[in-house]
From Swiss-Prot:
It comes from Escherichia coli O1:K1 / APEC. This is Regulatory protein AriR. Belongs to the AriR family. GO terms for molecular function: DNA binding. Homodimer. Signal peptide: none annotated. GO terms for biological process: cellular response to acidic pH.
Length: 88
């Protein structure tokens, strides 16, 4: 996975990036999930915007069979949705 600074700089929604950056260890697992989603988007050449992050997280949620991991993905998705404008 890419370095945290690179991941946060790639996120187009700076308020979302700042929220995760300032959370410290409170959202450690969620930050890792977000980081993986952003890394996947960057490696595939997609724009790192909220819409694509949401789609990536939904895909991860649909494909995991691990209940605990699904819960972390769901929490991450909820946070991203809070920072997403209604007019997507």
């Amino acid at each position: 996975m890419l370095e945290d600074t690179t991941i946060h700089n790639a996120i187009s929604d700076k308020a979302l990036s700042s929220y995760f950056r300032s959370s410290g260890n409170l959202l450690e697992e969620e930050s890792a999930v977000l980081g993986q989603a952003v890394t996947n988007l960057m490696l595939s050449g997609d724009n790192v915007n909220n819409k694509n992050i949401i789609l990536s997280l939904i895909h991860s949620l649909e494909t995991t069979s691990d209940i605990l991991k699904a819960d972390v993905i769901r929490k991450t998705l909820e946070i991203v949705l809070r920072y997403t404008a209604d007019d997507m």
